[in-house]
Amino acid sequence: MSGLAKLLINVAAVILLTVSVQADTLANCTYEDIRGTWVFELGPSHKEGSKDWECTSTTQISVQYKVKITLDYPDIAIDEFGNKGFWTLIYNQGFEVVVGGSKYFGFSVFKDKTVSICSKANPGWAHDVLGHDRRCFQGQKQSPAVKFMKKTGRDSSLRFEPSINSEEMVASINKAQKSWTATTYPQFQGLTHDDFVRMAGGKRSRMLSRPRSVPITEKQDSVRGTLPSSFDWRKVNGQNYVSPVRNQAACGSCYAFASMAMAESRLQILTNNTQKHVFAPQDIVECSPYSQGCDGGFPYLIGGKYAEDFGLVEEKCNPYKGHDGKCSTESSCARNYVTDYKYIGGYYGACNEVAMMEAIYNRGPVAVGFMVYGDFMSYKSGVYHHVFENHPFEPFELTNHAVLVVGWGEVTSPSPDRYWIVKNSWGTGWGMDGYFWIRRGSDECGIESMAVEATPIFRFN
């Protein structure tokens, strides 16, 4: 047994003796749990521009309208009037439907910290496709029936420092393979278990299951042949279209940083580098109803839906603090919007390597989520892949860490390998000046399974 495996077993024993209560988590619902016929109940319209469009699990809806909608395979939505639209699962926690000129988004219901009720949607947000006629709605699935599902989590008060960032773990990683190099980081010393979890996505970004990247089609295989073997938006005709690396610190706001970075880069591309914005992740952490602050969130809902519904503000309007708080963004701050947000491939579960390459090359960097293992924290350089896949226990909670893919490349030494070029949000003192390479073409850690893109709307300043 390797030194790292022994170390992980020892860590497991400590954790198993320590953890005794469950953490508060969000729902854990699958595609088949959501697919079927639903009835959406809509409340009264909110005055446009008002700040009272708050739809939460405690919202009491005075039902004014009901609409029946069938959600079918793979992403088809049909309302009771015969209008045809589309829908997508949003990770394992909710869904969005666009049909009949209206949009509906809601989180699935969860109760008692462990039970997901996937046949119900918490009071969520409904509006027409232009962002007007804003209402709260709630959903009830009619058929087929869905059973309760249970899941577990860690105690959110746990204060245990795992042996991540230890010399022993780093030595074991470097001995086991030659594709990438691990190192220890002084800035990680003294961080708690909760700190590491937030850095890697936050407790509310945990996913008990994730989609696999779909097989590459014959048409996509021909598209691959038209794309360059390497590409990097930092180096296009002597221009850099990617904003600087930032540091999220010990706040689970990676989803906000990845979303802001995608909007920043795509706006630079759209304006031929004449507009270089730095958008405010703190506005997301404090103000977004579609995420959970420093406990996590997802780029589809922030770089996409929030940016379209509410807009993004400049960093100077709400400078980054790295912790939760009351929304302090001034209403006078200018808003920058996006449109046409979607999962790469069209819906959740339709992504793959070639679809990502095509989107990146033709439209700009994409925000992705991938599963973070403990060894990733020690990455220094090279083509990352998870080490010791079959060890008996992984002491680090698997979270969905959001980052920005800006390009791709290939290496021939020490062995041939293909990789993605990825911008992280842990500062320039981590990895390769804040970037990392990760194996491409094999859905390493799920990085090719749920990429997101959105198109910024150009503003004349």
Predicted region positions:
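Tryptophan-anchored aromatic micro-motifs
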Residues: A23-Q60, G85, K120-H132
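Generic short beta-strand segments
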Residues: F40-K47, G100-S102, M371-Y373
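Extracellular beta-rich ligand/substrate-recognition surface
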Residues: T58-I61, D79-E80, Y343-A350
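Contiguous, well-ordered beta-strand patches that form the walls/edges
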Residues: L71-S116
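Catalytic-core signature of thiol
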Residues: K147-N461
